[in-house]
């Protein structure tokens, strides 16, 4: 930009930076976990122009659970708000017999090392086991080629999941290409935002569960004090739910405009 003009690459960079800011704001405001995870994957696919992708979440027993799957060209949409369960078993981060780290799978390797892995062509790669991918391709006629796996690290630098993108597509030719080096930092930045949002969401949910446990404990103690009011604290919430549900279903009358959000 020596002559004071802005070239196309700088415009794209500025646009992507603004896009990341907008995505970060949206992620921090989302309170539905399924919608949050879907947004993370869909925005990553959009930024990288990827045909498919998978979002894995790390479980307490050190496995990567499939949470969201998308492959546009095959019309595959599973997990999240779709209501379609993902039947693939979780990926083990450690061998169940030896306890050794599982670096054969590209997603588990990204989780274990904490580093992004960019593979131009899975069929030419000898570092990872893509036998499952090739079997999937044989059954669907698909051709899995380029992969980009990004670990999701929270504020404590702990890997809580993996974002895996599949088959970057050239916007001009429609050809499947490798994920460009300039795209990887964008996805990594998105991954950082996603990890913080997911971590905060998990923290909120754990706090809600703790609060619910305290309420149930107090209610049980109150009910146990008197044989005359036993079960009262258990019945009141159920009756309240029934009344609220009935009010929401009203099409006319004083409660026709009454509506509760999922969070409420």
Q: Where in this protein do the model-derived segments appear?
A:
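Signal-transmission linkers at sensory-effector interfaces
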Residues: 1-39, 46-47, 67-70, 203-217
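Signal-transmission/dimerization alpha-helices at domain junctions
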Residues: 2-3, 112-116, 162, 185-205, ...
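Regulatory loop-to-helix N-cap segments in sensory/regulatory domains
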Residues: 2-12, 138, 143, 158-160, ...
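Short, hydrophobic-rich beta-strand element in sensory/regulatory alpha-beta domains
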Residues: 42-45, 51-58, 62-68, 107-109, ...
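GAF sensory/regulatory domain recognition
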Residues: 54-101, 124-125, 163
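Signal-transducing coupling segments at domain and membrane junctions
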Residues: 65, 102-108, 115-146, 168-178
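A short, aliphatic-rich beta-strand micro-motif
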Residues: 145-156, 161
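Histidine- and acidic-residue-rich, metal-dependent catalytic cores
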Residues: 213-264
